[in-house]
Amino acid sequence: MLPIATKSGQCTSFLDALFTATSAVCVTGLVVNDTATYWSLFGQGVILLLIQIGGMGIITIAIAIAVVSGRKIGLMQRSTMQEAISAPTVGGIVRRTQFIIRTTILIEIIGAVLLAPVFCRDFGFWKGIWYSLFHSISAFCNAGFDLIGIRTPFSSLTSYSVQPIVNLVIMMLIIAGGIGFLTWEDIKNHKWHFKKYRMQSKVIFMVTGILIFLPALYFFYFEFSNVPLTERVWVSLFQSVTPRTAGFNTADLTLLSEVGQMLIIMLMLIGGSPGSTAGGMKLSLIHISEPTRPY
């Protein structure tokens, strides 16, 4: 609501400010004002901070602050954290919290570094660095907030629909945030020994692959058949990755058929993985390993 948060120097209405803050901390990505053209650098920074808190989880942030301040973490707090990240046991929660924070920061820095050459070329060095960091955090946290509206308000990433670096990096960040921190723990501990992964991680990889590949095929053959081949490939892949709570888009979704829009809705409903930055019902709920049997 503060004047310093807007480029015009005017106060934002309470409802608009509340909506934006809620959308950011809940990593929803819905906006009533274009993030790039309406909010000042300070306002964008506040939004980014809320996205980061929402992505890692308020409980994770609280435990991290407690650890840094030297406070003892009680059993109730450990149990709450266990539920928040879908950990199998209460033991090792503090260690897992530290792992979550380190992994989040590392992946977001890598994403920003990879995006920097493109954004620095298009927007200048300092603005390019800021845009790279903002979009890296927003993508990893599956938030969907963007600053590309500086070209055309509310346009999301449509101006980068055929830019390979932006497409690849944003998609990988969305997937990285969406598979969950316990899956990243398996990757860290077992590397390429996939058989040693916990069942949840195996299910997540399998269902994630299916939910990217099959929608991409549909979009490629039925929704974007009238665009050039290169753009068709990138747009189809991107639109199969981003609906599961990320919120970016590189195509005008209003031009999709009703079937295509329904597919987008279903992907949004499914969401990401347990203990991830994504929302939705979670991947594990749609996977049935075997039919229920009487005993």
Residue ranges and their predicted role:
Residues 1-293:
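Membrane-proximal intracellular helices of multi-pass ion channels
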